[in-house]
Structures are given as structure tokens and as C-alpha cells.
């Protein structure tokens, strides 16, 4: 009888685990956000604002809380050619058991239309936003140890503008932010490889994420964060960059560039659906580990990295 009871407990546990992320909803969010309706989600366009409305609608459905009476936090900046552009960051949160904060982010903008061709950005970065929504859904039903701030950044493709604006105009005390987890391009890889970038700066992250890819069907690799790598150092290549400049530890999940990167062929039908679901599962496993062991992660990052980062900031 005890063995039978144990079997049923394990069966129930396995079933719940399998339902942590809804594959159907994950793919639905990606497919919708990368459809022609949003015309590539370029910052400052009506279609970008339509995408923002979809995402904040999902925030509301999930039950996220918001700051300053809205999920939407507008900001203004000048483009590289001097044009005044309005962007909007989308921010919701789930209160944790502690005062510490983990920022979980994904940029929702892409590059729009060029020569009548729509660049829908399925992998870059409708996939990250869909993953963010899946994580928010999970943690709404599983209270985290730390407060989780879910941020869909705008203006990433125009120079990480949303991330810089967020740090200049924080919705909460910035000293509470102890970790940033960024999702950018997580649905397209033929080798079943997902990179977790950030352990060069904080080696403890690699230890915390050990075996986070178990039963996900994909492999988490570490790298692309050594300053000696030049362009292959991804630290400043997505929204984690401004956080790194502010000495905030980060983990950036993403894949290496692929044949459809920044091309009109970055479409829903060209992503790897099994890989995407596995990546989302592995990221959830990773975030659970990070949430449970956040106290181990310190802002005292690798001194060599900090020196190189300051040099890059001066050069820029």
C-alpha cells in the first residue's frame, strides 16, 4: 500500500512538473507577436504600440501587479540620425518573500520594415517575450523567494534604450536589484544549445546553474562573456549591458547567431518549437535555482571584467 501511495505521489509530482510551462500558450504568444499584424514591432511605430498592448493585456490576464498605476512606462530618446523617438517599457511584478529583487527581461521591439519586407523577429525577440510571459505565469502560481520584476524592454534594437531608461528612472530602489536575467533569442538552434552568459563575472552562477538543463532536452553552455573575446563577448550586446555597467550581476540566455538573424526569414515557421519549449523549461529551472540561492551572488564581480568594461565605456 505504501509503495502504491508513493507511486501515485510521484506520478502527481511528475504531472505538475510537466505542466509548469504551457507549450500551447508559449507558442501562441510567439506566433502572435511575430505575425505580420505588428509589422516588425519597430520602436516608435503604431504597430510597436499594438504589440505593447498585447503584452500588457497578457500581464493583466496573468495577474501581475504594476507600479505608478500602469504597466506602461514611456521614455524618449534621439535615434542615431537625430530623430526624436518615443519608446515604452512594460513592467509588472510579483512580490516575493524578501525585499530583494530579480529583474527578468526580454525586449519586444524589432527592426520593422525594410524595402517593403517585414522583419517579424520571431526569434529576435518574440521568443524572449513569450518565455518571459511563461515565467510570469509560473511564478504567479508559485510564490518566489524574491520579488520578481518582469520587464519587456523597448528600444533594444536602437541601442539598448529601454534598459538605460529603466536604470535612469527606476520604479523602485535600485539597490534592491541583486540580479538581472535577460532572455533574447531562445527559440532557434539546430544543435540544442542555449548559452547562459554571465558566469565570467560571477563564477558562482555556473555552480548554481549546474544540471539546470536536466530533462529539458537541451544543453546549457557557458561562455561569450570573457572580455578578451571582443565581439564574441555578448555582455554589451543586449539589455544586460547597462546592468553590467552598473555592476549588477546578470545571466543572459540566448543562442548564437543563425541564418535568419535580422532577416525577413526570422519567422514563426522557422523556429525550432521543440528547442524553444526545452529552452523555456531550462530557463525556468535555472531561475528557480537562482531564486533559491540569490544570497550567494555578489556584486563584487571579476576585477578583470570591471577594468575591461570601464575601458569599453570610455571607448563608446
Features from the language model and the residues they span:
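Metal-dependent peptidase/peptidase-like ectodomains
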Residues: 99, 153-252
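His/Asp/Glu-rich mid-to-C-terminal helical/loop segments that flank catalytic regions of hydrolases
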Residues: 44, 259-316
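A non-catalytic alpha/beta surface segment that caps or lines the substrate-entry region
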Residues: 41-94
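Alpha-helical metal-binding/catalytic segments enriched in His/Glu/Asp
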Residues: 92, 104-105, 109-110, 114-159, ...
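Solvent-exposed loop/turn segments at secondary-structure junctions
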Residues: 37-40, 59, 65-66, 79-82, ...
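N-terminal capping segment at the start of a domain
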Residues: 21-50, 62, 259-266
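Bacterial Sec-dependent N-terminal signal peptides
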Residues: 1-21
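Second-shell loop/turn segments in exported
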Residues: 36-46, 78-81, 116-125, 152-153, ...
Amino acid at each position: 500500500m505504501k509503495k502504491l501511495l508513493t507511486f501515485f505521489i510521484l506520478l502527481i509530482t511528475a504531472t505538475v512538473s510537466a505542466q509548469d510551462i504551457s507549450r500551447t500558450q508559449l507558442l501562441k504568444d510567439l506566433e502572435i507577436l511575430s505575425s505580420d499584424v505588428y509589422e516588425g514591432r519597430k520602436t516608435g511605430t503604431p504597430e510597436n504600440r499594438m504589440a505593447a498592448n498585447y503584452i500588457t493585456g497578457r500581464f493583466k490576464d496573468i495577474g501581475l501587479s504594476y507600479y505608478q498605476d500602469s504597466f506602461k512606462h514611456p521614455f524618449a530618446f534621439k535615434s542615431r540620425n537625430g530623430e526624436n523617438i518615443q519608446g515604452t517599457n512594460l513592467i509588472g511584478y510579483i512580490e516575493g518573500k524578501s525585499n530583494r529583487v530579480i529583474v527578468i527581461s526580454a525586449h519586444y521591439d524589432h527592426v520593422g520594415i525594410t524595402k517593403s519586407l517585414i522583419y517579424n523577429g520571431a526569434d529576435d525577440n518574440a521568443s524572449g517575450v513569450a518565455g518571459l510571459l511563461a515565467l510570469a505565469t509560473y511564478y504567479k502560481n508559485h510564490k518566489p523567494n524574491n520579488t520578481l520584476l518582469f520587464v519587456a524592454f523597448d528600444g533594444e534594437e536602437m541601442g539598448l534604450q529601454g534598459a538605460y531608461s529603466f536604470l535612469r528612472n527606476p520604479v523602485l530602489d535600485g539597490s534592491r536589484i541583486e540580479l538581472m536575467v535577460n532572455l533574447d533569442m531562445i527559440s532557434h538552434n539546430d544543435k540544442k544549445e542555449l548559452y547562459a552568459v554571465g558566469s565570467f563575472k560571477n563564477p558562482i552562477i555556473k555552480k548554481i546553474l549546474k544540471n539546470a538543463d536536466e530533462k529539458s532536452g537541451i544543453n546549457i553552455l557557458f561562455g561569450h562573456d570573457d572580455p578578451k573575446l571582443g565581439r564574441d563577448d555578448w555582455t554589451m550586446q543586449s539589455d544586460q549591458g547597462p546592468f553590467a555597467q552598473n555592476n549588477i550581476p546578470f545571466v543572459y540566455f540566448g543562442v548564437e547567431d543563425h541564418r535568419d538573424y535580422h532577416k525577413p526569414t526570422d519567422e514563426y515557421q522557422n523556429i525550432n518549437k521543440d528547442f524553444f519549449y526545452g529552452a523555456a523549461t531550462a530557463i525556468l529551472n535555472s531561475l528557480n535555482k537562482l531564486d533559491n540561492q540569490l544570497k550567494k551572488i555578489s556584486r563584487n564581480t571579476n576585477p578583470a571584467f570591471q577594468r575591461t568594461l570601464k575601458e569599453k565605456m570610455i571607448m563608446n
